[in-house]
């Protein structure tokens, strides 16, 4: 009996008709696709995008070269070199983030004791030449300077959850 039902199912191509029915059913349902350059999904308030280094209001950079972000990075994307200044404080001389390695987990932002490194809401960026994937300290500071008001507003809104 089992062979007979298998023969009729294969003769009538029921699997093929089932697949065609499924395709026909989804043809008339609303689409969930977003046409990306013209339309965009709303971003989460906690979206983690391109990194930035912040400064204090007096213009001094916040990073104290504690290297916690470098130590906590699971992808080993952060490289920091530091040196002592004349006044005895330690500051970074090199702060590089390899965006090809970075997994945007946010551990660097959470581990920073002075809120120096933050992840912005910049989603769209590109590289034209080899080596542009490594973002250095002046570039990170420029991003932070440009977006400081937005970063401060977002961190103030999220302060209750930290």
Swiss-Prot record:
Localization per Swiss-Prot or TrEMBL: Cell inner membrane
Reported cofactor(s): [4Fe-4S] cluster
Membrane topology: Peripheral membrane protein
Any one GO molecular-function label of the UniProt entry: iron ion binding
Assembly and interaction partners: NDH-1 is composed of 14 different subunits. Subunits NuoA, H, J, K, L, M, N constitute the membrane sector of the complex.
One BP term from GO: aerobic respiration
Protein's gene: nuoI
PANTHER family: NADH DEHYDROGENASE [UBIQUINONE] IRON-SULFUR PROTEIN 8, MITOCHONDRIAL, NADH DEHYDROGENASE UBIQUINONE IRON-SULFUR PROTEIN 8, MITOCHONDRIAL
Annotated EC: 7.1.1.-
Keywords: 4Fe-4S, Cell inner membrane, Cell membrane, Iron, Iron-sulfur, Membrane, Metal-binding, NAD, Quinone, Repeat, Translocase, Ubiquinone
Gene Ontology CC annotation, any one: plasma membrane
Annotated catalysed reactions: a quinone + NADH + 5 H(+)(in) = a quinol + NAD(+) + 4 H(+)(out)
Signal sequence range: none
Ligand binding ([4Fe-4S] cluster 2): 73, 102, 105, 108
Catalytic class of the enzyme: translocase
Binding site for [4Fe-4S] cluster 1: 63, 66, 69, 112
Protein name: NADH-quinone oxidoreductase subunit I
Entries under SUPFAM superfamilies matching the protein: 4Fe-4S ferredoxins
Cofactor binding, note field: Binds 2 [4Fe-4S] clusters per subunit.
Family statement: Belongs to the complex I 23 kDa subunit family.
InterPro entries: 4Fe4S_Fe-S-bd, 4Fe4S_Fe_S_CS, NADH_quinone_OxRdtase_chainI
Annotated organism of origin: Xanthomonas euvesicatoria pv. vesicatoria (strain 85-10)
Major location (coarse): membrane
NAD is among the record's keywords: yes
């Amino acid at each position: 009996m089992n062979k007979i039902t298998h023969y009729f199912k294969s003769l009538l191509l029921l699997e093929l008709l089932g697949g065609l029915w499924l395709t026909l059913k989804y043809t008339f349902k609303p689409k969930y696709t977003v046409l990306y350059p013209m339309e965009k999904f709303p971003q989460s308030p906690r979206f983690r995008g391109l990194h930035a280094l912040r400064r204090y209001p007096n213009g001094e950079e916040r990073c104290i070269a504690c290297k916690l972000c470098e130590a906590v990075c699971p992808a080993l994307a952060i490289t920091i070199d530091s040196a002592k200044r004349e006044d005895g404080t330690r500051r970074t001389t090199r702060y590089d983030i390899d965006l090809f390695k970075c997994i945007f987990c946010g551990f660097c932002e959470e581990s920073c004791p002075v809120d120096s490194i933050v992840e912005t809401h910049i989603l769209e960026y590109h590289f034209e030449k080899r080596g542009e994937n490594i973002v250095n300290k002046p570039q990170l500071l420029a991003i932070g300077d440009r977006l400081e008001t937005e970063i401060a507003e977002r961190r103030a809104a999220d302060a209750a959850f930290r």
